[in-house]
């Protein structure tokens, strides 16, 4: 997909879904030649096209390893590193940002990673239509847009209705791991997850950063600006 075609696709999506609640913000962006080449040559091996019917993840990965859903991977650097650290776990990574998709595919090739599959679609629709109940061992959502202004808080991804959609997809014993560098959003995340009887916090409030999660470029920048970082890890118990 060329950069022009990408922008046209985004415009068409907005026209067809004028009032949809989405997991992302469409934005104009430039894809490098290397990112475009990665999409052109690697999508057939590591990309999964959206379908409005349940998918067999074991078949798509060619393995029965544990499955982790990652929503919003940015440029994919942290995703690739997590997959490298956890080679016996499969990662379904979803984002709509073309350059990020291309970059993650490039990282998959460079690092010889076989345990990542990439989707370029709205994660809400993927969760609603493609993921079977009890198909996930974990869910990662790292640094979602905090929508700082109060009037925009309704656009935040981490709200009770979306968590309610995610929960059936998790196996009992599976986990949700969230991270943010916006304290007020961290408080909201804690309140939302704590409101579900079927979720149990693995810490008193905020969790230590698990060993598998590397520091992201976004996170490092925030720390330089004096921001804190909050991780939350909740386990499904019923």
Swiss-Prot record:
Example GO molecular function: tRNA (guanine(46)-N7)-methyltransferase activity
Positions that bind substrate: 149, 181, 216-219
Residues at which S-adenosyl-L-methionine binds: 70, 95, 122, 145
Entry keywords, A to Z: Methyltransferase, S-adenosyl-L-methionine, Transferase, tRNA processing
Disulphide bond pairs: none
Active-site positions on this chain: 145
InterPro entries attached to this UniProt entry: SAM-dependent_MTases_sf (IPR029063), tRNA_(Gua-N-7)_MeTrfase_Trmb (IPR003358), tRNA_methyltr_TrmB_bact (IPR055361)
An annotated GO cellular component: tRNA methyltransferase complex
Catalytic activity: guanosine(46) in tRNA + S-adenosyl-L-methionine = N(7)-methylguanosine(46) in tRNA + S-adenosyl-L-homocysteine
EC numbers, comma separated: 2.1.1.33
Pathway, per record: tRNA modification; N(7)-methylguanine-tRNA biosynthesis
EC top class, as a word: transferase
Family the UniProt entry places it in: Belongs to the class I-like SAM-binding methyltransferase superfamily. TrmB family.
Role summary: Catalyzes the formation of N(7)-methylguanine at position 46 (m7G46) in tRNA.
HAMAP family: tRNA_methyltr_TrmB
Protein name: tRNA (guanine-N(7)-)-methyltransferase
The species this protein was found in: Neisseria meningitidis serogroup A / serotype 4A (strain DSM 15465 / Z2491)
Annotated gene: trmB
């Amino acid at each position: 997909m060329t950069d022009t075609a990408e922008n046209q696709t985004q415009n068409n999506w907005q026209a067809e879904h004028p009032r949809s609640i989405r997991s992302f913000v469409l934005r104009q962006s430039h894809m490098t030649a290397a990112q475009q080449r990665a999409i052109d040559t690697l999508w057939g091996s590591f990309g999964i096209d959206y379908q409005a019917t349940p998918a067999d993840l074991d078949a798509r990965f060619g393995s029965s390893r544990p499955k982790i859903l990652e929503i919003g991977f940015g440029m994919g650097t942290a995703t690739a590193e997590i997959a490298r650290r956890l080679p016996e776990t499969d990662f379904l990574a979803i984002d709509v940002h073309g350059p990020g998709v291309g970059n993650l595919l490039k990282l998959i090739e460079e690092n010889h990673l076989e345990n990542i599959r990439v989707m370029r679609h709205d994660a809400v629709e993927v969760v609603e239509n493609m993921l079977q109940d009890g198909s996930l061992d974990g869910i990662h959502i790292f640094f979602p847009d905090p929508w700082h202004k109060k009037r925009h808080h309704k656009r935040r991804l981490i709200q009770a209705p979306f968590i309610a959609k995610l929960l059936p997809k998790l196996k009992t014993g599976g986990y949700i791991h969230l991270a943010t560098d916006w304290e007020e959003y961290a408080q909201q995340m804690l309140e939302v997850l704590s409101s579900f009887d079927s979720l149990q916090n693995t810490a008193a409030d905020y969790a230590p950063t698990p060993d598998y999660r590397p520091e992201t470029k976004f996170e490092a920048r925030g720390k330089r600006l004096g921001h804190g970082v909050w991780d939350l890890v909740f386990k499904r118990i019923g």
